Amino acid sequence: MYEFYLKRYAEIYFLVGKLEFLLRKHIVATLRDFAQKYSYGEWHQLIPNTPQNKEAIAAAKIASRGLDFESFLPFSFWRHLFRREYFAGLWVPSLHLAFLGIPNAATKASFKIVCRNMKRANNIRNRVAHFNLINAGDHEEEIATLLWLINAMEEPSG
């Protein structure tokens, strides 16, 4: 039974890692482009100045020793960028551009779907990271949620 769950965990954790990589890559790129276009400083200056965000950025900068601190930001940092209060300030002007696989990504409907799936992905990530077998979810649903986000961030083919 242990090997059964271990294989499921490995599959999910790989997808969480891929999603986190894509979030770092695409969100930073879109925010960096926006910051340059409108003469802001660094991309992270566009992030809401909450205590949680400030702490995450400060800790990442220390851990990274000044090099690519984005790689040291926790998954929850990326997840919290997709909150309803950030629709007008982050999603519409910039973040929707990270989701090339969503037609009409700038819409409120698209934003709500991304928010819901990011919240779910964060819960999946936390469950798997803490090896919580008791609260194992529907494996196929978890895979589908993660793949939806991954596919939404990749350019459509064809």
Positions of predicted regions on the chain:
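Amphipathic alpha-helical interface elements
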Residues: 1-158
